[in-house]
Amino acid sequence: MPIITDVYAREVLDSRGNPTVEVEVLTESGAFGRALVPSGASTGEHEAVELRDGDKSRYLGKGVTKAVENVNEIIAPEIIEGEFSVLDQVSIDKMMIALDGTPNKGKLGANAILGVSIAVARAAADLLGQPLYKYLGGFNGKQLPVPMMNIVNGGSHSDAPIAFQEFMILPVGATTFKESLRWGTEIFHNLKSILSQRGLETAVGDEGGFAPKFEGTEDAVETIIQAIEAAGYKPGEEVFLGFDCASSEFYENGVYDYSKFEGEHGAKRTAAEQVDYLEQLVDKYPIITIEDGMDENDWDGWKQLTERIGDRVQLVGDDLFVTNTEILAKGIENGIGNSILIKVNQIGTLTETFDAIEMAQKAGYTAVVSHRSGETEDTTIADIAVATNAGQIKTGSLSRTDRIAKYNQLLRIEDELFETAKYDGIKSFYNLDK
């Protein structure tokens, strides 16, 4: 039977050693689902609330026992007494949103609500004997995503003196996901060798990318291009580059202040100068995607950037849109950006996540399914990427098990789909003039 008989949450640890929420759901028939909730380092101010305890004597205030209690003492009784079917995802998600009663899930916590939402979906898939991607996407979920591999970490994700948070490679010239993963791995290892030869650090950051002390942004870019060529691939044809600028992390009082991360030599740019700078980088290097190139509240700057390079570069809103359909709708109406980053914990339920992806795709925006810097062994985002035919996934570098787990899950899915599996490569950037 599909009726849920037990919902249980516990406090576990994420990839940074910080507490997070794990939720388990059980049905009458024994179907079971488990979910672990991720956590971000650089967060948009409009994100749903991640509930932390604030007790400095325990986990430095980062405990999640309040969120766990909210699952076990508030959400679980509501689901069990209401005799909800595990197959009724939308009703359960809406019930939790109503039970919270705040616009940002600040009462129960998005980390509590999301854990239940994903665990319910996993239990439903188990009940039906289906893989999660097939339960979520039906027979039409068959497109494997282009991986956006974050091989150099800067900004808030590392101690490297570079303002931009992520430098990514995208193997769009591959013909299968399996091949794209191999290309990325070969480039990653070539990059490590090049860094070692230069006497630079090869320790990795939160998302598995290297965090050496480059001599600035262009040094990082040119070193990555060198690694692509050393691996035997053609930059700008087979492999493109991408940035996550995370501009909100160094924007203050109308100024993009690179010195926050780059020290006394870091530039200070107005919005117009920031647009000019990003355009110069796009003109000089094979860049296909830029995330959060402008501050989340600098909508005039976003408009300028979109008008300037939005026809040839994917401009992804992360802190800008925070997986929120109300904000995304405003962005679509005003021609802001051309893509949305999808992070399940920014909004807090699977239902709202799927609504955001659908809205973006209907408007001709791309949707990039993404991890967080604080991750776990949970692989749900891999299944979501295939279920929604998103075409792109951002889940870190080619090291750290919390990142590799998602890539390995995509390899399994590609194998399961066999001849029906698609990898569209450059065609996944369907709204660009490429």
UniProtKB/Swiss-Prot annotation:
PROSITE patterns: ENOLASE (PS00164). Its cofactor is Mg(2+). Pathway: Carbohydrate degradation; glycolysis; pyruvate from D-glyceraldehyde 3-phosphate: step 4/5. It is found in: Cytoplasm; Secreted; Cell surface. The keyword Magnesium applies. The active site is at E207 (proton donor), K343 (proton acceptor). This is Enolase. Binds a second Mg(2+) ion via substrate during catalysis. Its EC number is 4.2.1.11. It catalyses: (2R)-2-phosphoglycerate = phosphoenolpyruvate + H2O. Mg(2+) binds at D244, E291, D318. Phosphoenolpyruvate binds at A41, K343, R372, S373, K394. Belongs to the enolase family.
